[in-house]
A protein has these predicted regions:
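Membrane-interface alpha helices of multi-pass inner-membrane proteins
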Residues: 42, 135, 146-162, 174, ...
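Short helix- or helix-capping micro-motifs
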Residues: 102-110, 155
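Membrane-proximal, lumen/periplasm-facing interface regions of secretory-pathway glyco-
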Residues: 311-360, 368-389, 412-416
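Transmembrane-lumen/periplasm boundary regions of multi-pass, lipid-linked membrane glycan transferases
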Residues: 157, 167-261, 276
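Extracytoplasmic catalytic/substrate-binding loops of multi-pass membrane glycan-assembly enzymes
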Residues: 24-36, 45-57, 65-69, 206-209, ...
Length: 552
């Protein structure tokens, strides 16, 4: 072991592992972690927003620990694994002389640092990207059947981590088009497809909900150079912190001397260019480009080994980065260290305040898939995120969580109220109000399907009831939400629908009723889409229909 990994390397790796464990234990969850913890309460082959790997890791962690570490333990393990694999991917024999430089380089990469203890889909994405590159490198040197099989399994694991993983596989393939004639490469693809088939089946059974949301239904906004394209370049700087100059310098200086280096360059440039083009359509989130951290770490470390000037400055700035990031990690635990409130601050406090007033009564959070799992994690009580026309669908829209609150006394929390039976305060000072409701009932899974008008402006509306019980039509009120071309809701109007059969008073279980309607004229100009929603029992209308593009 010490022949491959120097003693100093193993010592620093152990220190890093302990640091991440301590950090993971004392840092409160961020909202996305709470949401993925909610995933893990019911393991499945897929979820609304992401493939299931993050939920699987959280489930494994929960077998070993309770609390925050029960969410994060496997992230700490995978982080160590990523460091080990990256070290193995460095061929330069002089690397043993620069162990400290190696750790400073990786520790300075801000998001890689954070994903050393936070559990998000990008955590396994980083690990399996590194492992995929290691297997691909071995495949280039010795393309055996077993290497192909293992590579196929890892390709599937990549895709189970996050859909962005397709970019890793695509750009590595583009760097070596001869793979298309390599039967061992096709074996890897076949193994990957077989391993990934349960998720394909889940997508099919759930009407490809994840793909449709990410590609078509996700709201956008008007293009802004500052927010979109310039913001993207800021993100490219932010992921490498103070070492960004030397990381990109190493990328520019590296020449494609072999197929593996060519793969690293194609992967890095490919992802950067892909999201640069995407930035003209929508805002690119920082973590979307995190996968370039793996190939650039290899390129940057090889560069610093051979370039004394870069090595000197990367070492100096790496120490500064380490100090800054350690202080930032302390601030994640202890908020007074900086005058900024972050997601890891005060969650236990607001949950405790709300729980003291609501007791064991389930809480329904309107339009908040973030607050609902956070409250459930720290209180242990049932929650539900009720989504309406001003929000978006999420995991609560497709699972059975609605049944946990049906016909029960609940507390309904919404940011739209200015008074209520109880209040609680978020760490940022925002006051939320909640009201008690008896015998709560919602029908958020009713489906509204709009058919194109055959004559003039009359549309056909099909309303499908997926529930195991019948629903009285008198409880349902219809609305149409108009949105701009970016799918941002701007106006909502009550909708009059006419049933095809006037004798129908019940929407039976697993049945569909047909209605006719004419679109009311909106006040807004430049409308792009409309969406039909159903308001039941006095609630705001839901997301029962899909956005329908209006013809000009």
């Amino acid at each position: 072991m010490t022949q491959k990994f120097p003693r100093l390397f193993l010592i620093l790796l152990a220190v890093l592992f302990i640091l991440n464990l301590v950090q993971g234990y004392f840092t409160e969850l961020i909202y996305d972690e709470a949401y993925y913890w909610y995933y893990a309460q019911n393991l499945d082959w897929g979820y609304f927003d992401h493939p299931p790997m993050v939920a699987f890791l959280i489930k494994l962690s929960s077998f070993l620990f309770d609390g925050e570490l029960g969410v994060r333990f496997m992230s700490c393990v995978l982080s160590v694994g990523t460091y080990l694999i990256l070290w193995e991917l460095i061929d330069n024999p002089k690397k043993k002389d620069y162990v400290i430089h190696f750790f400073l380089l990786l520790f300075s990469m801000t998001l890689m640092n954070a994903y050393g203890f936070l559990t998000l889909p990008d955590t396994p994405l980083l690990f399996f990207t590194a492992l995929f590159l290691l297997l691909y490198k071995r495949f280039l040197n010795n393309p055996t059947i077993w290497t192909s099989i293992f590579m196929g399994v890892v390709m599937a694991a990549l895709m189970y981590s996050k859909y962005h993983a397709v970019l890793v596989i695509l750009f590595v393939f583009l760097s070596n088009l001869k793979l298309i004639k390599d039967r061992n490469a096709w074996l890897a693809v076949a193994v990957a497809l077989v391993c990934y088939s349960p998720h394909f089946l889940w997508l099919y059974q759930n009407d490809f909900v994840s793909i449709k949301y990410h590609l078509y239904e996700r709201p956008n906004q008007a293009y802004s150079f500052t927010k979109f394209t310039l913001g993207y370049f800021v993100n490219l700087v932010a992921i490498f912190g103070l070492l960004f100059y030397w990381v990109y310098l190493s990328l520019i200086k590296t020449k494609s001397t072999n197929k593996f280096t060519k793969a690293l360059l194609y992967l890095t440039y490919g992802v950067v260019i892909f999201f640069f083009i995407s930035s003209f359509n929508r805002r690119v989130q920082t973590q979307w480009v995190i996968i370039i951290s793996i190939p650039t770490a290899i390129l940057a470390f090889n560069h610093l080994i051979e370039n004394a000037n870069s090595r000197k400055w990367m070492y100096r700035m790496g120490i500064v980065s380490m100090i800054v990031l350690i202080y930032a990690r302390m601030w994640l635990v202890h908020s007074p260290l900086l005058p900024i409130i972050f997601e890891t601050h005060g969650n236990k406090q607001w949950v405790s305040e709300l729980n003291s007033k609501a007791g064991d009564i389930p809480i329904i959070f309107e339009n908040s898939y973030r607050s609902a799992p956070m409250y459930e994690f720290y209180s242990g009580n049932s929650t539900f995120s009720l989504n309406n026309h001003m929000y978006r669908k999420n995991q609560y829209s497709i699972d059975d969580s609605e049944e946990r609150v049906r016909h029960k006394k609940i507390v309904y929390v919404t940011k739209y109220r200015k008074s209520g039976d109880i209040t609680y305060t978020y760490p940022d000072g925002t006051v939320f109000y909640g009201v008690f409701m008896n015998d709560f009932e919602s029908y958020r899974k009713l489906e509204c399907i709009v058919e194109e008008p055959h004559e003039k402006s009359t549309y056909t509306l099909k309303v499908y009831n997926p529930y195991e019980f019948d629903i009285p039509l008198e409880e349902l009120k219809y609305t149409v939400a108009y949105s701009n071309k970016y799918k941002q809701v701007k106006e909502m109007i009550p909708l009059k629908v006419k049933p095809e059969s006037s004798s129908e008073i019940i929407l039976k279980s697993k049945d569909t009723l047909f209605f006719q309607f004419e679109l009311p004229k909106p006040k807004m100009e430049n409308h792009g889409y409309f969406r039909i929603g159903i308001a039941e029992n006095g609630l705001l209308p839901g997301l029962n229909g899909k956005p329908v593009k209006l013809k000009e």
